[in-house]
Swiss-Prot record:
Gene3D superfamilies named among the record's database cross-references: NadA-like (3.40.50.10800)
Cellular location(s): Cytoplasm
Transmembrane segments: none
Assigned EC number: 2.5.1.72
One Pfam match: NadA
Catalytic reaction annotation: iminosuccinate + dihydroxyacetone phosphate = quinolinate + phosphate + 2 H2O + H(+)
The protein's role, per its UniProt record: Catalyzes the condensation of iminoaspartate with dihydroxyacetone phosphate to form quinolinate.
Protein name: Quinolinate synthase
Cofactor comment text: Binds 1 [4Fe-4S] cluster per subunit.
UniProt GO molecular function: 4 iron, 4 sulfur cluster binding; metal ion binding; quinolinate synthetase A activity
Provenance organism: Pseudomonas aeruginosa (strain ATCC 15692 / DSM 22644 / CIP 104116 / JCM 14847 / LMG 12228 / 1C / PRS 101 / PAO1)
UniProt entry keywords in alphabetical sequence: 4Fe-4S, Cytoplasm, Iron, Iron-sulfur, Metal-binding, Pyridine nucleotide biosynthesis, Transferase
Requisite cofactors: [4Fe-4S] cluster
């Protein structure tokens, strides 16, 4: 499998001109205009934790949702709005459309993709699956609609371990894609028989154990929070490992006052909102400035700006379309995930 196209697209994006920074007055004007458009168009704004703080705050202020990809999918599926504006990366918009084909789904830009999605082209992935027909195909949500349509299950990082444990209990060997680091983490946690694709997230793969150990020495009382898309050596240093929502919960419940966080720094908005008396520090990446590709912030998440959000509402640009022939096949593994997690919630409530 090749990652030439992935590397070229990453390099092209990082070399592109970045959006201008709005003044405080311009920012306020854009926020007010977006709120008015959302109301006028019966639309709701859904933002991922990795988006810039101003976008997350706007989603909250306008009655939308700020969450991980699982809750984004659930919220968009259950909300009555006829238009869903997804501030995130393209697979999130596609997921919203698959679950809500009758709704209009907009994104601030269709160029906001994901290195995991780029690194798992459907033709190569389908051939890989065909070579292992005895395996249950489980894919991470960070994949295209076409890859989801080839899968038996879709999972997010917040439910992956539980779903793989369920499949393991049924004696099912698993073919996993695309994130190799998350796949290995699930293997270690469950002992499942898993064959792994070799994709990786450009943000999380940059975290390095040696630099993290050095930072821990500077902050010996800090707890280390790590997303499982990070390399195994980084995960091994963690006090808590989990999805974005699980890391936020850990920040709330652990007694530490300082946290070193190995995930996208966009998550600090929600962590600081919920834990105003605690300090959060970015985990070190492989380099600094021009030496790192992401510097702990997804370059595609950063494309979700106020200007682009307003433009997509006013112009109807950035609309997500999914091949109607794919939707029935792609919705099946997504619904399995949503039904499984809903049943797990009910069981937890019953045991509370």
């Amino acid at each position: 499998m090749t990652h030439i196209s992935e590397r070229l697209l990453v390099q092209a994006h990082l070399a592109a001109k970045q959006p201008r920074v709005l003044s405080e007055q311009e920012s306020a004007e854009h926020r007010a205009a977006i709120a008015a458009e959302l109301k006028a168009q019966n639309a709701v704004l859904v933002a991922h934790y990795y988006c810039d703080p101003v976008i997350q705050a706007l989603a909250e202020e306008t009655g939308g949702c700020v969450s991980d990809s699982l809750e984004m999918a659930r919220f968009g599926n259950q909300h009555p709005a006829q238009t869903v504006v997804v501030a995130g990366v393209r697979f999130m918009g596609e997921t919203a459309k698959i679950l809500n084909p009758e709704k209009r789904v907009l994104m601030p830009t269709l160029e906001a993709t994901c290195s995991l999605d780029l690194g798992c082209p459907v033709d190569e992935f389908s051939a890989f699956c065909d070579q292992h027909p005895e395996r249950t195909v489980v894919v991470y949500a960070n994949t295209s609609a076409a890859v989801k349509a080839r899968a038996d299950w879709v999972v997010t990082s917040s439910c992956a371990v539980e779903i793989v444990e369920h499949l393991m209990d049924n004696g099912e060997p698993i073919l996993w894609a695309p994130d190799q680091h998350l796949g290995r983490y699930i293997q270690r946690e469950t002992g499942a028989d898993m064959l792994l694709w070799d994709g990786a997230c450009i943000v999380h793969e940059e975290f390095k154990a040696k630099q993290l150990e050095d930072m821990k020495a500077l902050y010996p009382d800090a707890a280390i929070l790590v997303h499982p898309e990070s390399p195994e050596s980084v995960v091994a240093l963690a006090d808590a490992v989990g999805s974005t929502s699980q890391l936020i919960k850990a920040a709330q419940t652990l007694p530490n006052k300082t946290f070193i966080v190995a995930t996208d720094r966009g998550i600090f908005y929600k962590m600081q909102q919920l834990c105003p008396d605690k300090d959060f520090i970015e985990a070190p990446t492989a380099g600094n400035g021009a030496a790192c590709r992401s510097c702990a912030h997804c370059p595609w998440m950063a494309m979700n700006t106020l200007e682009r959000t307003l433009a997509c509402l006013r112009e109807g640009s950035g609309e997500i379309f999914v091949d109607p022939a794919l939707i029935p096949r792609a919705v099946r593994p997504l619904k399995r995930m949503l039904d499984f997690t809903q049943a797990a919630r009910l069981r937890q409530a019953g045991n509370a």
